[in-house]
Design a protein with these regions (language model features):
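Structural motif
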Residues: 40-49, 148-150
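A charged, well-structured terminal subsegment
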Residues: 118-138
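Glycine-rich phosphate/pyrophosphate-binding loop and the adjoining helix
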Residues: 22-26, 133-223
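A short beta-strand-loop structural module common to alpha/beta enzyme folds
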Residues: 28-42
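Ser/Thr/Gly-rich flexible loops in soluble cytosolic domains mediating phosphotransfer, phosphorylation
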Residues: 83-104, 201-226
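Cofactor-binding loop segments of dinucleotide-utilizing enzymes, especially the Rossmann-like FAD-
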Residues: 8, 36, 99
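Helix-loop-strand module that forms the ligand-binding subsite of alpha/beta enzymes
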Residues: 47-124
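N-terminal beta1-alpha1 ligand-phosphate binding loop
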Residues: 1-31
Length: 226
């Protein structure tokens, strides 16, 4: 899947969250990244439209500012999307990756903010609907500055899953993705060091066994519900 990820952040180099996401995507996915602050300095609308039309999946990535996306994203949409016809983007996928400074529990019914992140950013769902695009559930990252290394590793895999698939983030789909990506990475490692082959193969076998056990457990739970 050809994914183009548009970053709307005024200083990506000084943002630990954006740097982590960018490095993860560049190193472990085929996604193309576009910095909107750089693009808008010398905007060529035809080139931007060509890039959109060539993509299968379009991702907007940004920090939440006052319950919305940064203004530059809307400025870019206004200039680049306004002359496009819905038929030109029909069937493509639109997704949103948003970094939120507040706690997750604040953004829900009864929480401090009283609205979910999806509700606050519902304008992007309307945009996708207008252009007859498929809209993915929002990928929200809360309080990145407080998560530990293990949580960051989990975040990286979830982020790659979001970038590279249109599947629902169910446990079985997610685990299959990790196994497939791990096999790719492992084959690259083995190509440079054949001594690693037995260790990597054992790792893959363990993942596949866990996948089987999870699928079996989910099947039992489903039968119980029925």
């Amino acid at each position: 899947m050809k994914t183009v990820c548009y970053i709307a952040h005024p200083d990506v180099n000084q943002s630990s969250s954006q740097q982590y996401l960018l490095e993860s995507g560049l190193n472990y996915s085929q996604a193309q990244y576009v910095n909107l602050y750089e693009v808008m300095n010398n905007l060529v609308i035809e080139q931007e439209q060509d890039r959109l039309l060539a993509a299968e999946q379009i991702i907007f990535q940004f920090p939440m500012y006052w319950y919305q996306a940064p203004g530059i994203l809307f400025e870019w949409i206004n200039q680049v999307w306004s002359t496009l016809k819905p038929s030109q983007l029909k069937g493509k996928t639109l997704g949103v990756v948003v970094v939120v400074g507040g706690k997750k529990e604040h953004y829900q019914s009864g929480g401090r903010e009283g609205r979910t992140v999806s509700e606050l950013l519902s304008n992007f769902e309307v945009l996708a609907r207008h252009f007859k695009m498929n809209y993915k559930p929002i990928f929200a990252i809360h309080q990145f500055q407080y998560i530990n290394e293990q949580q960051k590793a989990h975040l990286m895999w979830r982020y790659l899953f979001y970038l590279e698939t249109n599947e629902e983030e169910r446990l079985t789909n997610y685990q299959r993705f990790i196994i497939a990506r791990a096999k790719t990475l492992i084959s690259e490692e083995i190509a440079t060091d054949h001594n690693l082959a037995p260790l990597w193969q054992a790792f893959i076998s363990q993942l596949e066994m866990q996948e089987f056990e999870i699928e079996e457990l989910m099947g039992i739970n489903l039968e119980e519900e029925l």
